[in-house]
Swiss-Prot record:
Protein name: Triosephosphate isomerase
Broad class of where this protein is predominantly found: cytoplasm
Gene3D superfamilies in the record: Aldolase class I
Function recorded in the entry: Involved in the gluconeogenesis. Catalyzes stereospecifically the conversion of dihydroxyacetone phosphate (DHAP) to D-glyceraldehyde-3-phosphate (G3P).
GO cellular component terms, semicolon-separated: cytosol
CDD domains: TIM (cd00311)
Entry-linked SUPFAM superfamilies: Triosephosphate isomerase (TIM)
Subunit field text: Homodimer.
Superkingdom in the source lineage: Bacteria
Listed EC numbers: 5.3.1.1
Length: 226
């Protein structure tokens, strides 16, 4: 729920300057920004004159479709009409603090995909689940939950993001080896579900910083960072 508008504008100017100075071209990587809802359209407008294309990502979308009367909600259709390209679904904070179940996330994914949005779908396991040996089962089940509402034609419009929840704020660290092991399992699961699985992007949503970014990027099944 931050930063404030003035701070966000300053950060955006600094971001655009970095793009220009470092010549980070589209051939090198895709880049997206996920500002708070109130800053979505202003961010998109500001990025229109950036040195390269940067897509705008909504942090959430309503589980209710058809532009109904749901006070406070932001529909997939409204995001699409505002020319937003991607939306985050299933982020660990939404799962934890808002108790978003598989049914709720499925509804959000369906609405987003049917409206023509692309989905960044987050999966991950807790510390308790990992220590009990259930990590792979939990993560693959989350992907299977998504698969139950996705058509064959929609898979190319989905990006998977793995969040090692057990390593966020617990004092434990997910090594590049840990991340690659889970990403490989996710890749294996995706290839069993869809013919697009081998080519789908799988992002790492752990603590990515300058000190470990290169090592993480070198892992064969890690295609970027969240």
């Amino acid at each position: 729920m931050n930063p404030m508008q003035a701070d966000a504008k300053q950060l955006l100017q600094e971001f655009k300057q970095l793009l220009q100075e470092n010549e980070i071209t589209e051939e090198k990587c895709n880049i997206g920004l996920a500002p708070v809802t109130l800053a979505l359209t202003s961010t998109q407008a500001e990025l229109a004159n950036a040195a390269r294309s940067v897509f705008t990502v909504a942090q959430d979308v309503s589980r209710f479709g058809n532009m109904g009367a749901y006070t406070g909600e932001v529909s997939a259709e409204l995001l699409k009409d505002s020319q937003i390209e991607y939306v985050l679904i299933g982020h660990s904070e939404r799962r934890e603090y808002f108790a978003e179940s598989a049914a709720i996330l499925n509804a959000k994914a369906q609405n987003a995909l049917n409206a023509g949005l692309k989905v960044i779908y987050c999966v991950g396991e807790s510390l308790e689940q990992r220590e009990s040996g259930q990590a792979e089962v939990v993560v693959l089940q989350q992907i299977c939950d998504l698969a139950s509402v996705v058509t064959a034609e929609q898979w190319p419009h989905i990006v998977i993001a793995y969040e090692p929840i057990w390593a966020i704020g617990t004092g434990k660290t997910a090594s590049p080896e840990d991340a690659q092991t889970m990403h490989a399992k996710i890749r294996e699961g995706l290839t069993q579900i869809t013919s697009h699985g081998a080519n789908m992007a799988i992002l790492y949503g752990g603590s990515v910083k300058a000190e470990n970014a290169v090592e993480l990027a070198a892992c064969p099944d890690i295609n970027g960072a969240l």
